[in-house]
Amino acid sequence: MLFKRYINCPLCFERIKISDIGFKCENPGCKGKPAFFRPPNSISPLEKMGLKSAPKRYPHECGNFATARICPKCQQEIPTDVDELSDMSIAIIGAKESGKSHYVAMLIHWIRRMGMEFGWNLTAMNEVTIDRYDQEFWRPLFVKHESIRSTNLVRGAGQAAPLIYSLCIGRGLLSRRIMLVFFDAAGENLEDASNLWYINRYICNASGIICLLDPLQLSRVREVLASKYGESSLPEINKDTGLIINRVENLIRRHGNARGNRIDIPLAVAFSKMDFVRDAGENAAGVYDELFRETRHHGAFCEAEFKNIDGLMRAWVQEVDVSASILAQSENFEKNAFFGFSALGCNPKGNGERLDRDPRSFRVEDPFLWLLRQKGLIKAMKG
C-alpha cells in the first residue's frame, strides 16, 4: 500500500512533505518548547518513499506524547488526519460588493442541509473553522439578521484563516473523504503586490475557482435598474467586475501553472443578486424563471439542467456585457461554466444592513456541484 508523500498545507497553501510535519505538545504543564520537529534520523526510508504511514503522535521531551501536528512552513497547527484525505481547495474570488461572504455562508449551510439527499457528511476540521463560521457567518445572518461585512484585504498573517472541512461522500467501503478548503479573497487583492504572496499559492493550487461577479456593475443592467429604482439603490460603480477573470488568468500564468494555451483549473463564473435583475435585458426574464424554479439536482448533478442554465446565462451575459470581455476571458480556461444565484433571496434594508427574515438562497450550490462533478466526486444524471 502506498501512502501520500506530499500535501498542500490548508493554511499557507505551500506544498509540504508529510514526513516533515512537526508536532506540538499540548500538555499545559510542559516546560519544554511546545512545537518541535522529528530528528531526520528518526524518519525511516520506507516513510520517505511512501511505503509507511507517518506517525500521528510523537514523544515530547516532557514525557508526554504530542498529537497536534504543525506545518513545517507556516508553523501553524493543521488537522491531525490531513494526510488521509484527498484535498480539494476551492478559491472563491470576487470584486467588491459581489457577495463573497454571503455566498460562502449560504453554500456551507446548503452542504450541511443536503447531507441526507447527497449521501455526504460535512465536518469542520478545526476549532478556528467552527468559531469563524459561527461568529462571522451564521450569527450575523440567522441570529442578528444582518448582512456580513465585506472581506478584508489580505494582510499577511492578519488574513482570516480559511474554512477547512472534511466531506465524507458515500458510505461503507465505497466512501471517499476529501478535505474542502474555502478561502474568499477580494478581487482587488490580485493587483496589490504586498498581498500577492499569500493569494498566489492558493489560487494557483486550487482544484477549482468560483469567480463571483456583481451584475449590478454591468452598464446595461445599471441603466435599467437605475431608471426603475433610482441610482441610489445601486452599489458604487466598481470597474473590477470586467477585469477580475483576466487578473486571475494572469496570476496563474505568471506562476507557470498553465499548461498550453488554456488553463486547466475549472472556472465557474457565477453572477450574484440575480433576484434583482429580472427586468434587465431581453433574456433576463427567461434566465430568472429558470434560476428560481425548483432544482433538479436531487442527489446527483443534473446535466440537462446545468446545460440549460449555462446556455441561458451565456446568452444574457452576451446581451448585457457591453465590453464583451467576460465571455471572452472565460474561454482562456479549458473548463468554464456560467451560473446565476441569490445568496440571501432578498434585498437588505436600511442602508443594506438589515434582513427582514432568514436568508433563503437560490442556486448557491450549482457552481459547487459542477466542480465536484469535474473531479468525479458525485454522480451525474442526464435529465
Where are each of the predicted segments found?
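Switch II of P-loop NTPase G domains
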Residues: 157-209, 216-224
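Flexible phosphate/Mg2+-sensing switch loops adjacent to catalytic phosphate-binding sites
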Residues: 82-83, 111-152
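Hydrophobic anchor at the beta1->P-loop junction of P-loop NTPases
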Residues: 90-92
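A conserved segment at the C-terminal end of the G1
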Residues: 103-113
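Conserved glycine(s) of the Walker
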Residues: 98-100
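Conserved GTP-binding G-domain of TRAFAC-class P-loop NTPases and closely related GTPase folds
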Residues: 201, 207-383
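P-loop (Walker A) phosphate-binding loop of NTP-binding proteins
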Residues: 95
